[in-house]
């Protein structure tokens, strides 16, 4: 699902995150609304801190059994680990099955299994029941994001094209990802540069633009993008990865090694990082 990074820049979110993290350090209990807890789960997940996200999900469920947000996160993790049975169990543990996020999760289960005929049937039936214009736009955006997340880009593009607001920034970002997937890097870069001009403080934009430059073997520009991203959020794993890969491309193997090691500290047991570290060590030997 598409996550709005701007949420994490709000002062109320920062206060909640600080209160939770301080409570965890001291062993105290902190109470907050389940929606606020779900935002913290999303933040950790978005930031690549999966263990922290899991810990928050467990804590949230200890206070709010059956709450949708933590179960959605756990189900998506199960899908990522190819454990569809566990994902289905998490889905069915949700109390409020009328919530739109429950529908999205059921749809995602079908998409993850490439049951596109079933997912399309579910989506079309649900879309017919939506009357409010804003709700329709949000639905189309979320469905488009689901398909793009699973590289079903043609289906994702089809639903995104139904949106009335073609200039919606989240829609444009998804379109840029679709273009990247098709190796249409120039058009993807133009979209991202426009988004950055409007809001240069979204580190995800810089990471995606850096990835485009990496695909073009333009490692200088890739590094510039990574450094902008890390100036906004020093510990974001996509930015760290982008910087390390750019350094490899520039021949700065010692710097790349240190950067991959920093990545591995945040994402322990990451096989791809261990491979990159091994490659750097071989080159330095």
Residue spans for each PLM region:
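TPR alpha-solenoid repeat register
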Residues: 70, 102, 135-139, 171, ...
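Short coil turns that delineate tetratricopeptide repeat
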Residues: 65, 97-99, 131-134, 166-168, ...
């Amino acid at each position: 699902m598409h996550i709005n990074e701007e949420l994490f820049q709000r002062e109320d979110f920062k206060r909640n995150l600080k209160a939770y993290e301080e409570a965890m350090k001291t062993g105290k209990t902190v109470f907050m609304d389940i929606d606020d807890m779900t935002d913290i789960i999303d933040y950790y997940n978005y930031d690549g801190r999966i263990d922290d996200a899991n810990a928050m999900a467990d804590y949230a469920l200890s206070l709010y059994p059956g709450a949708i947000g933590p179960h959605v996160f756990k189900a998506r993790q199960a899908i990522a680990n190819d454990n569809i049975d566990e994902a289905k169990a998490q889905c069915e543990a949700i109390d409020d099955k009328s919530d739109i996020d429950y529908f999205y999760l059921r749809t995602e289960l079908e998409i993850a299994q490439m049951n596109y005929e079933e997912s399309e049937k579910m989506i079309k039936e649900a879309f017919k029941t939506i009357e409010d214009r804003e709700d329709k736009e949000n639905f189309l955006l979320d469905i488009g994001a689901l398909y793009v997340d699973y590289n079903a880009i043609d289906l994702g593009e089809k639903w995104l094209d139904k949106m009335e607001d073609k200039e919606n920034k989240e829609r444009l970002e998804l379109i840029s990802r679709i273009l990247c997937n098709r190796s249409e890097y120039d058009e993807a870069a133009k979209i991202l540069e426009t988004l950055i001009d409007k809001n240069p403080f979204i580190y995800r934009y810089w990471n995606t633009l850096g990835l485009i430059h990496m695909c073009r073997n333009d490692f200088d520009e890739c590094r510039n993008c990574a450094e902008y991203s890390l100036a906004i959020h020093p510990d974001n794993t996509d930015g760290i990865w982008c910087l390390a890969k750019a350094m490899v491309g520039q021949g700065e193997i010692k710097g790349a090694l240190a950067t991959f090691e920093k990545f591995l500290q945040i994402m322990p047991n990451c096989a791809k990082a261990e491979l990159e570290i091994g490659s750097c060590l071989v080159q330095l030997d």
